[in-house]
């Protein structure tokens, strides 16, 4: 099941999922990108807002109301997992209207082959602005491609703050049911999520 969490009360940009981008709301654009890869019946928007719920219904998008107590998009996906049991869940953030269809396709295929692992998509950091930005999550992996550490800081760091080979998170994740079940029991955010 591909779940698109959508929160109306964003601190930085309230109402973000409903913002029109060339006449189409952001959440609908994100859904449309996902629908190019995944069948409509296997996509669900999870929201805590009636405006988003109504927009999804109007656009024939499967939607579920979730609690307004969810701290993160992953909490919203964990809440969906309590109601709809699947082997694994793919989380595509609702504010990714330009997410690459090819990236979604590759990620879905990889997730199907690795259903027992938590998977976090990433790509190269291409510019110094992203490398230094606290809004971009940077990631460090071991030689087996296992995530060691994620940070809003510029990692790996260097003395001159120059761009070096670095990776950033892409807002698409995959979780096995059991991992989401455990995640849903955590009631606090880590500092990186704040």
In which residue ranges do the predicted regions lie?
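A conserved hydrophobic position in a structured secondary element of the catalytic/binding core
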Residues: 47-48, 99, 175, 194
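Conserved core of the sugar-phosphate nucleotidyltransferase
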Residues: 100-187
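Hydrophobic/aromatic residues located in beta-strands of well-ordered beta-sheets
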Residues: 2, 43-45, 89, 119, ...
């Amino acid at each position: 099941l591909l779940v698109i969490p959508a929160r109306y009360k964003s601190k930085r940009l309230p109402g973000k999922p409903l913002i029109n981008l060339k006449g189409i709301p952001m959440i609908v654009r994100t859904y449309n990108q996902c629908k190019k890869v995944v069948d409509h019946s296997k996509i669900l928007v999870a929201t805590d807002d009636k405006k988003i719920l109504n927009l999804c219904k109007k656009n024939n998008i499967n939607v579920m109301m979730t609690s307004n107590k969810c701290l993160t998009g992953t909490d919203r996906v964990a809440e969906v997992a309590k109601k709809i049991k699947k082997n694994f869940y793919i989380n595509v953030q609702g504010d990714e209207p330009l997410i690459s269809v090819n990236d979604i396709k590759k990620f879905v295929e990889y997730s199907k082959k690795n259903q027992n692992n938590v998977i976090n998509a990433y790509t190269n950091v291409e510019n110094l602005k992203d490398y230094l930005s606290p809004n971009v999550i940077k990631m460090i992996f071991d030689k087996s491609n296992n995530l060691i550490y994620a940070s809003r800081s510029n990692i790996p760091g260097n003395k001159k703050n120059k761009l070096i080979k670095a990776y950033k998170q892409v807002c698409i994740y995959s979780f096995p049911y059991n991992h989401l079940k455990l995640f849903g029991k955590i009631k606090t955010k880590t500092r990186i999520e704040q």
